């Protein structure tokens, strides 16, 4: 009787495993495999760097891989539980689940922009990948998504893994910099600090609703931002998180 019950339990377990197999674990880290796994989950690998060898700080991670939103993010996120449950911070919650799963698969630990204080040094990490640069308006620009940067997390490795060499010039070098003149209230402009107060005040007006529904004018003006394939719905969600109290 006990053996029959055990066999039944084993059959149930095998059936459950077939329907919901555990994530594949990669004992030997492959950047290409990580890139593919991130893409399948709705993310892109935005850059990687050997941090410890650059800083000489023993407590720093040996390798950091930054993952963020790309063209496949919105269709996957918007149909996820987090994207539909109406609870606060849906993108952060989705990111921690997805990036956490990637970390389990590739034997990494994680860091998130929402962690803190103290906050992980995402800007420093990003600039060390040689795929992020400072734009004329002061915010970072990326080689494939322009000013539409949304880093969702970092995978941290305690050993140096093989990563692609990135020796790129800033996309701003040969650009006419429309980002510096597009903001209707000059909150983002060349050679000046970001005027956060002016930005938020504008978003409270009827004129500012195009930014709320489609995204920041300056970010959209960047020619490279087209590579992010942002939908208006995604931009609106990010803008609502940035400015939750719009009162046009």
Features from the language model and the residues they span:
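Non-ligating segments of multi-cofactor redox enzymes
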Residues: 27-248
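Extreme N-terminal basic, low-complexity initiation segments
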Residues: 2-9
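Accessible peptide chain termini
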Residues: 1-2, 25-29
